[in-house]
């Protein structure tokens, strides 16, 4: 497929952006380092701010390495943000809260952070998982020792609670899985109580779990999709039933369901495995990028094998659509030799949201011939006009390719690179990394932060794979970035919250900000460092509705 590759007050300190004149790079009040990601030429991103860097300590609680899956919500006027850390079970990450009273120590865990939404100041940190209700040992050999938590998700309340019937629970959960061993364990942590439950229905699927994502829909049925990067290399659909009684995980329908494999069919014939060159087709048929799917029972033997299915997400306003990306491998070796690869973005569209067992259709929206390399993490969000977009993050591994963040517009079928790993640290093709950093880095964890930091804000993290002393293990950083264009608006939409139009409220905001900018201001539209007549001219040029 040929495609066109095309919070306001929180950025309180400014550094010159290396590429795009309008981009501001900010060291947040709690971070010891400038942002690990920067814009590319022509980026729609206005501001990037670092929130926490590995090694930073808040009230004695330290940010440890290999941050991966994330989610957040508001508690009062503060943001509660949660991160899972992708440590091996043997990692000396210290004795965690959920290991209190046992002989276990270290491994993967879940950290929580309280953050000011207006300044990005981190107020405190804590272990979010405080006890376990697991029933089998993982690769760490203990009930309370976890290995390689990867992508994660904090589902919307309606995913686990039906307000109409009262079934389910309004407790917030963090769901993630072990991307290690067969089977890895799928873990749902009750963020209200700190109890981590094992979703045993996923055990028979023998997954190395990248993520488990619950559908955001009012229903008595709990639907969740698990992606297995390794092990079965398949995509599984969990179907459970919400209850009126039991512990919070039981009420949520997380412990009584069944997992089914996605079985892709083309022309009514089962597709056993995705192909690097031909996708859902074969050498005899040539490339095929769409088909149908059914749900197959039978544990690890059920369904189509994909090329390392990674992260996935539901369309927030369309519970029939689920998007997932597969990683596969790079289009070149580390030495630069060309090789076939098939990193793709797929959409599953269920025929009946009230009966997911009825199957649906599958389509490769990005078919492996695009600029995306080893797509790993993603988020799906809706624009101000109701369109659907996908942010995709790359994990090129130990390769000179700089890990990128890309934005895909489903309606226009356009793909744009917006961020890259800082080449001054991590290097790039033809450019060596700067010690202690290396070319082995991964962008991860991205989510739409409109409900916490405001419309136009997104949060991501960086895994920087160079060794640090225990308990840090490896480097990394938590960061946020701001772009009204990604929400379908434009830079002249400066009044907060952005609304997709340029009108008197934006002029009023610009006049309030008029003069020299002492920090990032959305009103400094042209990035000159001063809110002046040039910015006013841009607002007048964009007067009316603006579309990003």
Where are these regions (language model features)?
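Intrinsically disordered/low-complexity terminal segments and short unstructured peptides
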Residues: 1-6, 226, 240, 515
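Generic hydrophobic alpha-helical membrane-segment signal
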Residues: 6, 204, 299, 433, ...
């Amino acid at each position: 497929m040929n495609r066109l590759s095309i919070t306001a007050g929180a950025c309180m300190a400014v550094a010159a952006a290396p590429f795009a004149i309008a981009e501001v790079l900010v060291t947040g009040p709690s971070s010891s380092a400038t942002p690990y990601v920067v814009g590319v030429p022509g980026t729609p991103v206005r501001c990037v701010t670092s929130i926490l860097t590995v090694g930073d300590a808040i009230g004695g609680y330290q940010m440890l390495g290999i941050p991966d899956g994330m989610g957040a919500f508001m508690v009062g006027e503060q943001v509660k943000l949660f991160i899972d850390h992708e440590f091996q079970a043997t990692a000396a990450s210290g004795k965690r809260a959920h290991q209190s009273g046992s002989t276990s120590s270290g491994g993967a865990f879940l950290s929580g952070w309280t953050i000011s939404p207006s300044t990005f100041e981190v107020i405190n940190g804590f272990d979010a998982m405080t006890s376990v209700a697991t029933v089998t040992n993982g690769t760490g050999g203990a009930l309370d020792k976890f290995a390689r938590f990867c992508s994660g998700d904090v589902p919307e309340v309606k995913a686990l609670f039906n307000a109409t019937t009262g079934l389910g629970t309004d407790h917030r959960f963090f769901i993630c899985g072990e991307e290690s061993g067969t089977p890895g364990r799928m873990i749902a942590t009750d963020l209200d109580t700190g109890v981590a439950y094992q979703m045993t229905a996923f055990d028979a699927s023998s997954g190395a779990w990248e993520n488990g994502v619950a559908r955001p829909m009012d229903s008595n049925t709990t639907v969740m999709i698990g992606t297995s990067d390794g092990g079965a290399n398949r995509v599984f659909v969990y179907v459970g039933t919400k209850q009126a009684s039991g512990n919070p995980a039981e009420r949520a329908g997380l412990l009584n369901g069944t997992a089914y494999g996605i079985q892709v069919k083309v022309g009514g014939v089962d597709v056993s495995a995705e192909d690097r060159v031909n996708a859902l087709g074969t050498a005899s048929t040539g490339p095929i990028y769409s088909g149908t799917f059914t749900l197959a029972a039978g544990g690890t033997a059920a369904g189509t094998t994909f090329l390392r299915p990674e992260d996935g997400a539901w369309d927030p306003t369309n519970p029939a659509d689920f998007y997932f990306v597969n990683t596969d491998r790079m289009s070149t070796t580390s030495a630069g030799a060309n090789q076939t690869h098939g990193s793709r973005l797929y959409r599953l569209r269920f025929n009946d949201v009230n009966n997911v067992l009825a199957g649906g259709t599958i389509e490769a929206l990005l078919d492996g011939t695009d600029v995306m390399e080893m797509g790993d993490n993603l988020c799906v969000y809706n624009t101000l006009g109701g369109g659907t977009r996908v942010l995709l993050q790359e994990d090129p591994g130990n390769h000179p390719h700089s890990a990128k963040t890309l934005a895909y517009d489903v309606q226009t079928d356009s793909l744009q690179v917006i961020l890259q790993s800082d080449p001054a640290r991590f290097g790039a093709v033809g450019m060596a990394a700067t010690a202690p950093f290396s070319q082995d880095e991964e962008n991860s964890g991205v989510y739409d932060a409109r409900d916490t930091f405001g419309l136009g804000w997104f949060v991501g993290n960086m895994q920087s794979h160079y060794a640090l002393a225990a308990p840090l293990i490896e480097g990394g950083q938590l960061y946020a970035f701001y772009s009204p264009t990604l929400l379908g608006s434009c830079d002249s939409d400066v009044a907060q919250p952005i609304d997709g139009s340029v009108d008197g409220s934006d002029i009023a905001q610009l006049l309030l900000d008029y003069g020299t900018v002492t920090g990032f201001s959305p009103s400094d539209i042209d990035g000159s460092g001063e809110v002046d007549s040039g910015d006013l001219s841009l607002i007048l040029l964009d007067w009316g509705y603006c579309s990003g």
